[in-house]
Amino acid sequence: MASGQQERSELDRMAREGETVVPGGTGGKSLEAQEHLADGRSRGGETRKEQLGEEGYREMGRKGGLSTMEESGGERAAREGIEIDESKFKTKS
């Protein structure tokens, strides 16, 4: 059990030095903070998926995947003639 604690201490030290040690924990200043950030981000995505439904969530991902630093996904889709069905984005009542 002590090795588990040592490992957590090492990960915490790395996190305090600015390294991301938990997937999805970017921006956390400690191991615990990164764990909380990752958990919240995951839960937020699941909630959004429930609100939009599988199809809407997938369509929104397509649009987001088209975005670049220079233009939004919507701008790029319009420019390249890619059809994005935004009616699928509506939340389920």
UniProtKB/Swiss-Prot annotation:
Keywords: Stress response. InterPro entries: LEA_5, Sm_Hydphi_plant_seed_CS, Small_hydrophilic_seed_prot. Residues 1-93 are annotated as: Disordered. Induction: By abscisic acid (ABA) and osmotic stress. Pfam families: LEA_5 (PF00477). It comes from the Eukaryota. GO terms for biological process: response to abscisic acid. The keyword Metal-binding does not apply. Transmembrane segments: none annotated. Residues 7-19, 32-62, 73-93 have a biased composition (Basic and acidic residues). It is thought to provide protection for the cytoplasm during the desiccation stage of embryo development. Wheat contains at least 10 different genes for Em protein. Belongs to the small hydrophilic plant seed protein family. PANTHER family: EM-LIKE PROTEIN GEA1 (PTHR34671), EMBRYONIC ABUNDANT PROTEIN 1 (PTHR34671:SF19). This is Em protein H5.
